[in-house]
Amino acid sequence: MNRFIIFMFVVVTYFGLNVAFDMFPCPKNKVLIRNELGPGLVLQYHCHSRDHNLDVANLQFNEYKEIAFGDKLGKRTRWSCILKHGLYMRYYSEFIAYMMANVRRCGAIRNWIARKDRIYLIRNVNPPAVFRYTWNKTK
């Protein structure tokens, strides 16, 4: 009988948290991709998650793309991106732009900045930009 009570407590707690998770909405999380390669240089991006697949698109110098989404309980939210630039899009980098934590995040911002030397990240609008990835070169 004690095990049954513990089992019921766990089930009720789990479903109660699911309902509470949706009852109290929070600001959407954002992934920003910004082109700071230089004037006349185009940045190509392709980002996708488990539920969404953005088309391949280009950003001109000083343009940015904003992807807004909410974390989902049960499925870990993860956005992966491929950035390319250069002649024939020779330089590329593939990385995880956002991954949900163990608890839901509200209003998290991941600002990815593409520059000629590297790719930088600013978390939650806290400068300075921190180096994260280098560019790979295709043969």
Curated annotation (Swiss-Prot):
Question: Pfam families attached here?
Answer: Self-incomp_S1 (PF05938)
Matches recorded under InterPro entries: Self-incomp_S1 (IPR010264)
Q: Report the record's Gene Ontology biological process terms.
A: rejection of self pollen
Q: Does the keyword S-adenosyl-L-methionine apply?
A: no
Please provide the record's keywords in A-Z order: Glycoprotein, Secreted, Self-incompatibility, Signal
**Which residues bear sugar attachments?**
136
| Cellular localisation | Secreted
A GO CC term assigned to this protein in UniProt: extracellular region
User: Where does the signal peptide begin and end?
Assistant: 1-20
Q: Which family is annotated? A: Belongs to the plant self-incompatibility (S1) protein family.
- Matches recorded under PANTHER family: PTHR31232, S-PROTEIN HOMOLOG-RELATED
Q: What is this protein called?
A: S-protein homolog 14
UniProt organism field: Arabidopsis thaliana (Mouse-ear cress)
Q: Which gene encodes it?
A: SPH14
